[in-house]
Design a protein with these regions (language model features):
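A short, aromatic/hydrophobic, helix- or strand-capping loop or linear motif
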Residues: 61-66
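N-terminal intrinsically disordered, low-complexity segments enriched in P/E/S/T
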Residues: 1-60, 76-127
Length: 127
């Protein structure tokens, strides 16, 4: 599928998820929630810094790249334990999408939603 079609479909799906089962709602309540304001950074480096500020205690140097994002999502950097289920609420998503561009935004979303990367992250997108 072409990128131009993939991102809008993914965003639409995230904004209009299927109703959660009772069990899924209970599991979501038990997650540590992080809120990312998409209007709080102006470039990719700012995005990575903001993620590190939100999800680490600042005692470990993290990289400004997609691999570091994946590591931070896994946990173990002072805020959530390694492998602990988390939820990321991404506010002002369209601002971030414009700032980061569609190719990087799609790669970030793919990492966040990829359950095979040893992290358990629910994503909610708000505009």
């Amino acid at each position: 599928m072409k990128f131009e079609k993939a991102l809008p479909l993914l965003v639409r799906r995230l904004n209009h998820p299927e109703p959660l089962s009772r069990k899924a709602r209970e599991a979501a309540r038990e997650r540590l929630t992080y809120r990312l304001d998409g209007s709080s950074f102006r470039d990719a480096a700012g995005f990575y810094r903001k993620i590190a500020e939100l999800m680490t205690d600042g005692t470990t140097e993290t990289g400004n790249n997609l691999d570091a994002l994946n590591d931070i999502l896994r946990g173990g950097f002072g805020k959530h334990r390694y492998g602990e289920p988390i939820e990321l609420v991404w506010e002002n998503f369209q601002d971030s999408r414009e700032t980061l561009g569609d190719p990087l935004t799609l790669r970030i979303l793919n990492i966040i939603l990829n359950a095979d990367d040893d992290h358990d992250c629910l994503l909610r997108i708000l505009d």
